[in-house]
Amino acid sequence: MKTLLVPVTLHDALPSVFATAVLVARRFGSLIEGVALRPALAEYVPVDMVGGMTWLRDEEADQAEAQDAGQRFVAAMEAAGLPRREPGASCAPDAAANAGPRYRWQPDVPPGDAFLGQYARLFSATVVGRPGADDGSPRMTTFETALFESGRPILLAPPVAPACLGEAVLIAWNGSTETARAVAFAMPFLRRARRVLVLSAEGGMVPGPRAEDVARSLACEGIEAAHKALPAGRRTPGELYLDTAESFGCDLLIKGAYTQSRLRQMIFGGPTSHILSHATVPVLMAH
């Protein structure tokens, strides 16, 4: 977790996104890179005077918002006491291993989510806010683009900034490829955690290893992990994961995203959808 990408848009959870990234950077000596995520402009310019003026006004508004995003990012990093690195500066391998947390702002990046999906492939993880339905919430498209297009994990910041991260880790295990990838990406956190719990829920499993098997596998990596398999009841697997996370004192949840199809979860609900709607702790996700 030596490099973190923070796409910055103006939403209510932005302070939590910054705080989450800083907590990870302090834990691993990471470089945090911020970019302004702007909507893609239309691929054509209207030829009439009114349409052309509207397009120009929208472009100017987007540029002003990007400048505001950069100022907020820099202010948050400075307030956290992180030193600044200039964009384009190379990381020396020998120095990077022992470097402390630091940040840089990357100006003038292309607009649109397509850029984010591609650029995020260069980073250990991308930190985004938990999406919501309110106008001031982070956009679902930002989360999904980074999740599906980057090939890297997503660290989901809760609406309220966390006080700590990575001391008590809960793995929401369902036997799937997606969760196996999330666990693999989370190994830096798991190796440093004080407590790890592998949790499975009856009714939330797909064919695959059990929670007990995962705990044994982690032991071979030098990680002590407890395991628990909860029986089916009136609560859904998503509710069981979050309820147990709260009782465990979890400050980081590990979860594979969309083991069931995204469309199915949109219609019928599912663990990923429940966590996206209700998680109050940081969540590391992979697809």
What would you call each of these model-derived segments?
Residues 78-126, 222-253, 257-266, 273, ...:
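Structural beta-alpha unit
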Residues 13, 108-111, 138, 178-181, ...:
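Short secondary-structure boundary/capping elements
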Residues 18, 27, 113-162, 244-287:
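Gly/Ser-rich helix-loop-strand patches that form or flank binding pockets
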Residues 1-56, 149-152, 159, 163-232:
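Small/aliphatic-rich secondary-structure junction motif
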Residues 54-68:
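A short acidic, glycine-rich active-site loop
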Residues 69-81:
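Ordered, amphipathic secondary-structure segments that act as subunit-interaction surfaces
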Residues 44, 139, 166, 237-238, ...:
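Short Asp/Glu-rich motifs
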Residues 48-50, 170-171, 241-244, 269-270:
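Short low-complexity, flexible loop/linker segments enriched in glycine and/or proline
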